[in-house]
């Protein structure tokens, strides 16, 4: 048996937990290990170490290629993570095998590579997003989650907004933050490069993790080869001091008046534990030209404070976890009680670090 045949048998996707899918020489690579990090409103990055019997793969041929990291699940299905190869490195050779390291990123990373200075007048947020991202065709593919377009409509037109020596990514991140929008990256079979950017206004509209949805939640349980499903092994709850409300004010020099907004804490568990007076923020008139806009800004700031008042950190063996998805944790005795004792505890995955 020659080395190539032995390699194909040992590193066949049928015998491996992880595999790479792609065109050309990507098919010759077998995953040895990988790590990655992803988060809401941030660019993910996977670093994949792969081996191949071909020690002469041209690294330039891998740049910009679409690749999908396949993960075999406990039930026999597969989880997909798709991106573009940003960097390819040859780490050396060991006997008849060569090692390569691939860095995989979403298409939105391309927006970090260009700086522009331009002005938009009397434009809605979605039209500005389209104007900025259309330069990244054919890679660019995005959509809006339920409720995002209504938030954009409520935000209205911007009379004047400037991008000055910013990357397109910095500019878009600033606009989304002002409008109270976030984004996440999701798999999309209709996208030309297998993944899409999803803009959202309400995290409750984001999809549930497939393992959590199929099993009625994910158990807080041990990790063992005899278990039939993945589980969460550690979960730590961290609480922070909250405030009872937020006040916002903008000064209109022509009308000689202050435009104000105030948002109280929405959740009693936080408002009852407030330990300081309501914080006061002075904002630009362009951000709060009227009372409605000032109220919207106050509510967004209050949401940002409340979302950080109760944070969970944990670890587990659940192979489907992605940032920007929701899950329900069951059988965890130290989580806050729910009105329904049989219901699990709902969580939103903000950031996920992977190792495989």
Identify the role of each PLM range.
Residues 1-356:
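Amphipathic alpha-helical and helix-coil boundary elements used as assembly
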């Amino acid at each position: 048996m020659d080395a190539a045949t032995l390699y194909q048998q040992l590193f066949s996707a049928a015998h491996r937990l992880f595999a790479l899918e792609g065109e050309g020489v990507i098919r010759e690579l077998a995953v040895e290990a990988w790590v990655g990090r992803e988060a809401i409103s941030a660019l993910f990055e996977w670093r994949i170490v792969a081996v191949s019997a071909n020690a002469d793969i041209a690294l330039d041929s891998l740049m910009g290629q679409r690749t999908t990291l396949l993960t075999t699940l406990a039930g026999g299905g597969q989880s997909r993570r798709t991106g573009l190869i940003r960097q390819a490195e040859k780490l050396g050779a060991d006997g008849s095998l060569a090692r390569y390291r691939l860095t995989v990123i979403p298409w939105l990373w391309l927006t970090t590579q260009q700086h522009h200075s331009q002005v938009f007048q009397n434009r809605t947020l979605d039209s500005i997003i389209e104007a900025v991202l259309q330069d990244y065709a054919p890679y660019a593919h995005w959509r809006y989650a339920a409720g995002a377009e209504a938030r954009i409509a409520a935000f209205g037109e911007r009379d004047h907004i400037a991008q000055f020596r910013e990357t397109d990514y910095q500019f878009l991140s600033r606009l989304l933050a002002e409008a109270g929008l976030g984004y996440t990256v999701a798999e999309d079979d209709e996208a030309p490069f297998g993944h899409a950017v999803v803009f959202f206004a309400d995290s409750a509209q984001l999809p549930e993790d497939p393992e959590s949805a199929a099993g009625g939640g994910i158990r807080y349980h041990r990790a063992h080869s005899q278990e039939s499903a993945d589980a969460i092994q550690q979960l730590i709850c961290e609480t922070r001091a909250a405030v009872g409300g937020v006040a916002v004010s903008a000064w209109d020099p022509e009308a000689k008046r202050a435009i104000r907004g105030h948002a109280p804490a929405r959740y009693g568990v936080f408002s009852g534990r407030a330990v300081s007076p309501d914080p006061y923020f002075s904002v630009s008139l362009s951000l709060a030209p009227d009372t409605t806009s000032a109220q919207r800004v106050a509510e967004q700031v209050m949401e940002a404070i409340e979302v950080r008042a109760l944070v969970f950190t944990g670890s587990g063996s659940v192979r489907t976890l992605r940032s920007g998805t929701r899950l329900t944790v069951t059988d965890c005795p130290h989580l806050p009680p729910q009105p329904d004792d049989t219901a699990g505890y709902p969580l939103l995955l903000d950031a996920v670090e992977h190792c495989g």
